[in-house]
Amino acid sequence: MDTLADARSTDALIAELRAAADEGLSVLASSPFRWRHRDGVRRMVDLVEPLDFALRNTRVVARRVAVACYRHEPIPQGYAVFLRDLAGATDALAGELRANRMAVSMQEPLIALGRHSSELERTAVLSAEVVLASVRSMIADLLAVSGMDPLEATDQIPPIAGG
C-alpha cells in the first residue's frame, strides 16, 4: 500500500505545478519585460492537465493491481512486460522534459505502445480490464504531454482487437 500512498502524493506536486503555471501567466500578463519567457510558460501550462490525467491513470493502475494481488486475481503476464516498456518510454519522456525540450521524439514510441496495447491478452477479470483501459488512457495522456493534441492522441490508440 506504500505504492498507493506514493501515487497519491503526486496530487500536491500537480497542485504546485498548476499554481506555478498560473503565476507564470500572471507575471507575463503584468510585465512586458517577461514576454521573452512566454513560450516556455505556455508550454508548462499546456503540460499540467495531461500530466495530471496521466498521473491519475497511474494511480488507478496501481490501485487495481493492488486489488488484484489482494484478491489473488490473475493479471496476464504480458501486462507486466508491457508496463515495463511503458515505464521506459515514460522515463525517456521525462528526460526530454527535464532537458527543457518538448518530447516530440517520444510520440512514435508511445504510438507503437498504443497500437501494441490493442493486441494484449483480454480476460474476464475486472481488475485486469481496468488496468488495460487505464494504461491505454495513460498512453493518450502521455502523447498529449509530448505536445500532441489530446483528440489526435486518442485517435492514435486503435480499438482493442476482438473488442
Q: What function would you assign to each model-found segment?
A:
Residues 25, 41-163:
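Soluble C-terminal extramembrane regulatory/interaction domains of multi-pass membrane proteins
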Residues 1-10, 37, 48, 67, ...:
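Low-complexity, proline/glycine- and charge-rich juxtamembrane/linker segments of membrane proteins
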Residues 1-27, 44:
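Non-transmembrane accessory domains of multi-pass membrane transporters/channels
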Residues 22-40:
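Conserved catalytic-core motifs characterized by acidic clusters
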